[in-house]
Amino acid sequence: MSPLQRGMTPEEGAALLIHAYERGVRFLDTADLYGTYPHIRLALKDAPDYVVSTKAYVWDEATAAAALERAFRGIGRDYIDLFMLHEQESLYTLRGHEEALKYLRRQKELGHIGAVGVSTHFSGCVRAATRFPMIEVIHPLINRAGIGIQDGTREDMEDAIRMARDFGIGIFAMKPLGGGHLISDNAAALRYAIESPLLDSVAMGMQTFDEIDANVAAFEGDFSKMERLKDRPRKIMVHDWCEGCGRCAERCRQKAIAVVDGRAVVDASKCVFCGYCARACPQFCIKVV
């Protein structure tokens, strides 16, 4: 629903969130970057018991305080259930952002945050997070094929998650369908995430009522509805007004974008459809659909 992807209005996004809530979903994840606070704020009027997780690019007290305030104002609450540092990479990035982590821990002690965490595509970061006692939750990229893991294989990430769990850290996965690459075998991919003893929860992007119904049914043990979702592949559109500035290529952690003959070109085999390239584009010519 984000402006980075489908670009839904707050009313359209809220309708999806309320439908999911009515089907029993009680946890939602967003980010400062995604631009979906208005959608969530509207949905919370009819779905008040949602547990809300968000994340932001913050590195010190000032940036963390500003991002937390944006979340409070954005969703209309004075409490965030889970606040995370967005896209952490390693021990070194965690050390470089430690001031923000300490600030968030103080906010938890004051009752403004339920838990502090980090999101990452790196197994090394999952391991490094165990060295920071204020980190209680990790949001790692993990799926059946290991698509999108930046520094190793699925097995490397599983080993890192196992280590984090030994430290009592909660785990909720991202991209169980590998950004859409596993859509042709979506039932097996989702079954892996649901049945894994390493994962406490799974965050799934859903853009339609059918997707919500099929995924909820799968979590209840009925995978039969997944078949009808296989004909909905995702893609990135680069519009004609692309100037070839290269900012999208610089932003892409998957190295899935290059500038060729003055225009951004996407390697779909590497892309995980996160949409972050769209945010980096100064001409607003990239969209995930």
Regions found by a protein language model. Give the residues of each.
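Active-site mouth loops of central-metabolism enzymes
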Residues: M1-E11, S53-A62, L182-S184
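Short hydrophobic/aromatic-enriched beta-strand-loop microsegments
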Residues: D49-T54, I135-N143, D222-L229
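Short catalytic-loop micro-motif centered on adjacent basic/acidic residues
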Residues: R26-A31, S53-T54, G114-G117, A173-M174, ...
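Conserved short secondary-structure transition element at the edge of the structured enzyme core
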Residues: Y21-E22, R105-K108, F132, D166-E227, ...
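Glycine/proline-rich, positively charged
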Residues: L4-G7, I18, E22, W59-F172, ...
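Ferredoxin-like iron-sulfur electron-transfer modules
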Residues: M226-G244, K255-F273, K287-V289
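N-terminal binding-site loop/beta-alpha segment at the start of enzyme catalytic domains
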Residues: M1-Y50
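Conserved, mostly hydrophobic/aromatic
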Residues: L28, I40, V52, A71, ...
